[in-house]
């Protein structure tokens, strides 16, 4: 449920050019210090569904244009819950871990795929109606994370629920070095 909110000039209460120039002067040391650095941003499914999502995407595009290497890790819990509710499947959890049987997995795939497409589409439009309009942003992902099943724990079969086994750091780094934003889905 983490959001990184960036204060962009559009968000300022500045009424004068001198206020804008002061903002740029005040932020430029931070912009320069973090140029070429990798930022990992977590976007919960709540952020994707929020009315402010377009502004969040504009801020992500701005960070990218300032030379930041971005890895976006997104969630989809509310979208999954919505799909399960629509299919009359009762969600099952042990503690806070979803138990994903085959019927649930259909809803999970649909929700995660839809969330991913929404993020890619917003970023790929070049932030229409924003100062970042026309920016060429490439969003890449793939099978960069390998999972392993949780299996049966304390008598509970978690079916298709898993945890991270391996992350292909080298492939992620190559995509970042090539100027892409890396998008990682659950």
Predicted segments, located by residue:
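Short, Lys/Arg-enriched N-terminal segments with co-localized hydrophobic residues
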Residues: 1-6
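N-terminal glycine-/serine-/threonine-rich phosphate-binding loop
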Residues: 7-71, 177
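Short, basic, glycine/proline-bearing loop/turn elements
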Residues: 41-48, 155-158, 186
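Glycine-rich loop at the start of a catalytic domain that most often binds anionic cofactors/ligands
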Residues: 52-58, 82-91
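Hydrophobic/aromatic beta-strand patches that form the interior of the parallel beta-sheet core
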Residues: 71, 183-184
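Active-site glycine-centered loops adjacent to acidic/histidine catalytic or metal-binding residues
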Residues: 75
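Terminal amphipathic helices with adjacent charged low-complexity linkers/tails
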Residues: 78-80
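Ligand-binding beta-strand-loop-alpha-helix segment within the catalytic cores
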Residues: 85-181
């Amino acid at each position: 449920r983490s959001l990184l909110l960036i204060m962009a000039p559009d968000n300022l209460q500045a009424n004068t050019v001198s206020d804008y120039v002061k903002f740029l002067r005040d932020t430029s040391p931070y912009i320069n210090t973090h140029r070429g650095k990798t930022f990992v941003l977590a976007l919960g499914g709540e952020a994707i569904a929020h009315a402010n999502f377009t502004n969040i995407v504009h801020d992500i595009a701005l960070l990218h244009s300032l030379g930041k290497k971005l890895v976006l890790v997104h969630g989809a819990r509310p979208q999954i819950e919505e799909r399960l509710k629509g299919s009359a499947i009762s969600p099952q959890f042990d503690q806070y871990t979803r138990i994903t049987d085959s019927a649930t997995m259909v809803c999970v795939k649909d929700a995660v795929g839809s969330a991913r497409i929404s993020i890619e589409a917003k970023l790929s439009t070049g932030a229409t109606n924003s100062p970042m309009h026309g920016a060429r942003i490439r969003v890449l992902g793939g099978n960069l994370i390998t999972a392993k099943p949780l299996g049966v724990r304390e008598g509970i079969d978690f079916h298709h629920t898993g945890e991270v086994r391996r992350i292909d750091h080298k492939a992620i780094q190559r995509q970042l070095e090539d100027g892409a934003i890396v998008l990682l889905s659950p």
